[in-house]
Regions:
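Terminal targeting signals and extreme-terminal segments of soluble enzymes
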Residues: 1-79, 85-145
Length: 145
């Protein structure tokens, strides 16, 4: 039986500036929280997100999706989980869940591709990052094993 992927949990307190006229969090803020959780996940794997650029690569977002179930409001304390849902040689997909206590408010995903910063071309997972990203994936999804 495959092991579940590593998850990060990031706590977010909803700021007033993140809400709209209806008093709920504006939909675009969920993507910002996804980025916070994704960055935290990378840190848990043993590297900081900025190291990708230092190595001469970019991890470009090619797709994003958020499914909203309930609205978050100013002052709510939320937990945003992130995990690596798919790892392929040139692309990866992160999945997310936003909760207030036990209540799931939103789920989502972002898809990314590796790009060589010097050429702007698609490339395979950079060698120095294969091990850290493989640690995030469940064994059945690791193309490098």
């Amino acid at each position: 039986m495959p092991q579940p992927p590593v998850r990060s949990t990031t706590e977010v307190e909803v700021r007033y500036a993140e809400t709209d006229q209806m008093g709920v969090v504006h939909h675009a803020n969920y993507l910002v929280w996804f980025e916070l959780a994704r960055t935290r996940l990378c840190t848990l794997s043993g590297f900081h997100y900025h190291q990708i650029e230092e190595l001469g690569f970019h991890l470009m977002v090619t797709s994003c999706k958020v499914d909203y179930r309930r609205g978050a409001r100013y002052g709510d304390t939320l937990e945003v989980d992130a995990w690596l849902a798919e790892l392929a040689s040139r692309r990866l997909r992160f999945a997310y869940e936003v909760r207030r206590g036990e209540e799931v408010l939103a789920t989502g995903m972002t898809e990314h591709v590796w790009v060589d910063a010097s050429t702007g071309r698609l490339c395979r997972t950079p060698q120095p990052l294969r091990e850290p990203f493989s640690r995030l994936a469940s064994p059945s999804e690791d193309p490098n094993s």
